[in-house]
Each structure stands twice: as C-alpha cells, then as structure tokens.
C-alpha cells in the first residue's frame, strides 16, 4: 500500500513546518533510520520551504508519524493536528498534483518538480526506492510534463522572487540605488538575484558558506562575495537582505540586527527570509526599523496571478484524474506478478527436465523425429495435468467457474 503523509503550507504555519524540515545533508541518515527495523518497505522524503512529505510503501502511516516526531525530537501531539495522510488512490493523486505544481503556494511553479526529482534521487542512492515508488514518481514526472505542455498552468505566475521585489518596492521607491545582500547561493537565491538585479541595484553582495560558490554568483551581477561568518561586519551596509540557506539554526540573530540598525542610524532594512527552518530570528521582525517577511507572508502576493489560471487548474485536475486511474490499473496488475512468476518457474522446471530426458534419448541414438514427438507429448501432458485434474475434481458452481476461467486463460472456444 502506498501512503503519503506530511505537513505543508496549507496545513501548518511556518513555526511548525520548520520543526520537521530535513536538510539535504540529513536525508541519507533519515532514510536509513526510517527503514531500519520498521515495517516500511520503500520511502522517499520531499522537504522544501513549504512542505515536508514522506512517500512510502507500508502497512500503516502511524509508525511513520511516530518516527517523524521522534526523529525531530518533538511530541507527536504537537505535530499530529497538522499532519495529513493519504492512502490509495488519494496518495497517487497527491503526488501527481505536487509534481504538477497544483499543490504549491505559487500554483503552477516549476521548482517543485526539480525538488521532487532530488528527493527521488536521494532515495534511489540510499536504496529506499523500490518498484512501486519508482513507478509512482516516474508517472508523476510524466503527468507534470503533460499538464505543463497541454494547459496554461504556468502562465502569469507571480514567483516568490518577484513577490519579494514587489514588497521591497513598497518600502523603497525603487530597487535602483539600494544595496542588496543575498545570503546563500542555491537555486532560490539565484532566482531572487535575477529578479532583484533587474532593478539595477547600487550594490550586490553574496554571503555564502563556500566563498567560491558565492563568487561565481556574484560575478554574474558585478557584485562581491563574503563568507557567512562576515555577516555581522557587512549587514549594516545593506538596505535589502534576502536569505535562503539550508542552515538548521538561524544565522542572523536579534543582536546582530540591532547593532546594524544602530549603525545605520535607524534607516530601514527590508528583509526576506525564504528559508525553512528560518535563517532570521523571528524576533527581528519586531524591531521598528526592520520589515521582515517570511515565505508565508509572501503567500497573498503570489496569489495575484491565480484567478487567470483557474481554467488551467480545472484542465490539469481532469488530466490527473485520468492518470490516477491508469496508475491504479498498473498497481492491480502487480497483484498477479507472484502467481505469474510461480507459473513460469514451474513451466521452466518442466521444460528443463524434459530437455534433459530428450538429450539422453538422442545420445542413445534415437531418431530425432521420434525424440521430438516424444518430447512434445510429454510437455503437453505435464503442462495440462494439474489444470485437467482440478477441472475433473471440481463440482457444482466451482466447476462452472473453473471452466470459465480456463476458457479465458487459454483462449478456448466451445465447439459448435
């Protein structure tokens, strides 16, 4: 049975989501820990700014919920009210919707597809991706491609990066003339840098754990790079701060920002924290001269382009409904695999035995035509012995059922 369980921006606030997030470097250990000594056969973990989801093949989701709470050292009762669980067929539909961007904060955004592929790659590399989940995700990627190529779901999207620019322009008349500090150098920061730098800021600085990666991004926009441990020295020089790292703990604290505000003589700082868990301490937003926005704060802005895409959403849901039916058909066909494998193994044993017998006859000088005739008769009798015996011994309704099954299995047609 395929299950999906998780917490996302629909079900839980940021304060809860950040407590159960998984950094990319933690996934190998988490995957191994979940499948160790637990009745979980397959598992993949998708963890982004807006969701932490566990896709698994298991008997029940309860053991996974217990593990999630234990792994993150939180009480089950603290997170249980925010957790949603889906079994078949809803788990399949949910995976297809997530991959297609229908469950995202920004409806139709394409980044989630890459994030899901990363989650699948991590599961595959760590040996927790089996036949069912592999097929589920490959179908999810195929459905996402179909949705994007046949509907307008990706049109008129207001991205998180564009929303950040929109909010900044409420504080400052324009981006031009402002000094911007980007913290991190991942995909989200790259997107934000492209949007903000289109406004021709006065200065661009990239702060990153590895200076080389920071420099590579900074050079694209004529900026400079600094290390994360230099943030305290440089924060006061910037008017706009956009942060998105994978740090498990905040990297900008209240004290650091208070000192920066004092140095700036209370000129405002606009800050966007796109990280989960948060990069900037929540208390920073209470300072008078700081305008701090999180991923949840940007939700209303990114919804602005959704109305024009409602027709595309309906079309996408129809596509997904049909593909869910197809996948359920594949799952049902998997139920017959053990029987088919056993049937073929039995036939193969018979074949090998009769081939050995025939080879011995040929070695004794028997005529090949006679040996082939003998071989074909013996194979026919062996293959049909068990079903014939079962049909002959059946009675009443069982016999009628078996006769019908035999006719279907062997494509038999009754004589006129």
UniProtKB/Swiss-Prot annotation:
What does the record note on quaternary structure? Answer: Homodimer.
Matching PROSITE patterns, A to Z?
Answer: GLUTR
Residues bound to NADP(+):
184-189
One Pfam family, please name it: GlutR_dimer
Q: Which UniProt keywords apply?
A: NADP, Oxidoreductase, Porphyrin biosynthesis
The name under which this protein is listed is: Glutamyl-tRNA reductase
**Stated role:** Catalyzes the NADPH-dependent reduction of glutamyl-tRNA(Glu) to glutamate 1-semialdehyde (GSA).
The primary gene name is hemA
Q: Where is the active site?
A: 49 (nucleophile)
Q: Into which EC class is this enzyme placed?
A: oxidoreductase
